[in-house]
């Protein structure tokens, strides 16, 4: 649950604990650990293609990307309902009536960073390829949203009908 091996002392304590609720208490302790949110967030961040940099040739550092990473960790550590977690990432800015006033409202806005996580080619504007760059960004977002939230691979539909799912080009 935390992505970390137990220490020898933790193993000994668990093996020696003969109470009926030993396993449940261990699970509760692991779920309450901040390491739980960090581990689960790492798995989620892989799914949504999180990176601290833009990729491509210039690979510039994204100075504020950590805010999204920390939002995801908090969401797991505070047991945020999954439907809320998804809604905030897809439309967190639309859930607000005005500027964010509370930490929870700030999180809703930070969650929409998901929409900008894909690789970004900073050289495209220099070579007058802004339209292609935007199209690639949108295609990446559609592909990632399909795989993360629908469990579907949509990238093949750019060129041909899907081999297994009822999705056409």
Task: Locate predicted features.
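Short, structured secondary-structure elements
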Residues: 1-169
């Amino acid at each position: 649950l935390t992505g970390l091996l137990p220490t020898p002392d933790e193993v000994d304590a668990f093996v020696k604990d003969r109470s009926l609720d030993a396993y449940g208490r261990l699970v509760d302790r692991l779920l309450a650990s901040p390491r739980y949110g960090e581990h689960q967030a790492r798995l989620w961040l892989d799914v949504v293609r999180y990176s601290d940099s833009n990729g491509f040739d210039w690979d510039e550092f994204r100075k504020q990307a950590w805010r999204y990473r920390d939002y995801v960790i908090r969401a797991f550590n505070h047991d945020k309902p999954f439907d809320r977690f998804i809604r905030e990432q897809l439309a967190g800015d639309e859930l607000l009536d005005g500027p964010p006033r509370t930490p929870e409202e700030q999180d809703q806005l930070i969650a929409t960073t998901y929409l900008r996580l894909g690789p970004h080619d900073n050289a495209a504007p220099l070579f007058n390829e802004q339209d292609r760059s935007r199209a690639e960004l949108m295609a990446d977002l559609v592909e990632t949203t399909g795989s993360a939230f629908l469990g579907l691979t949509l990238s093949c539909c750019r060129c041909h009908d899907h081999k297994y799912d009822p999705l056409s080009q």
